[in-house]
Structures are given as structure tokens and as C-alpha cells.
């Protein structure tokens, strides 16, 4: 089980959740995503990892409650648990360092 440590409503129907997931936080890189399952039988919801904190062992997701599953997920609060969070998935972003002249 993965505990929601913090939930904020950033704008109407747009939510931020900080989730306790130490192994995921240690492996996450910019540009990757994760998959949330609220219950064992619920839909798999892919979401971008918005932030991660290795020391705290947390990852942050931001989502808009527009479909049935994300609307249901928006009703979860700090202290509630997700059945499963899988990740990090996907290829990390590649950073290109350009000089100020380029």
C-alpha cells in the first residue's frame, strides 16, 4: 500500500498528491511516469512524476479530475492509501546544455 501524505487542490479540479514510495523516489528521473491503481481491481492510471524527494522517499503527481477514475482519485485524502504504484516508467528526459550564445 502507498500512503498519500499530502493533497492540495491547485485549481478547480486540479490536484497535487505527495505519495510515500521510497523505492520509486530513489529511481525516478526527470521525464518519467508512474502508474497508480487505487484498488486491486481498479483501472491503471498513468501519471507524470512531477517531483520526487529521495530523502523523504516520496513522489509527487499532479492530475486533473476529468474522467471517472481521476474524479474518484480526487476524493482520496492525506492518510488514504493506493493499492499499487508502479514505476518509474518511460525514458528519462535528455538535457542538452547550450551556451548563452546558441
Language model regions located:
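FNR/FR-type flavoprotein reductase catalytic core
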Residues: 71-102
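Ferredoxin-reductase
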Residues: 1-78
Amino acid at each position: 500500500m502507498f500512503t498519500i501524505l499530502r493533497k492540495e487542490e491547485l485549481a478547480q479540479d486540479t490536484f497535487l498528491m505527495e505519495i510515500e514510495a521510497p523505492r520509486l523516489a530513489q529511481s525516478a528521473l526527470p521525464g518519467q511516469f508512474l502508474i497508480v491503481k487505487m484498488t486491486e481491481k481498479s483501472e491503471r492510471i498513468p501519471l507524470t512524476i512531477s517531483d520526487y524527494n529521495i530523502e523523504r522517499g516520496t513522489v509527487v503527481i499532479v492530475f486533473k479530475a476529468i474522467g471517472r477514475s481521476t474524479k474518484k482519485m480526487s476524493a482520496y485524502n492525506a492518510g488514504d492509501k493506493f493499492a499499487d504504484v508502479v514505476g518509474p516508467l518511460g525514458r528519462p528526459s535528455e538535457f542538452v546544455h547550450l551556451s548563452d550564445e546558441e
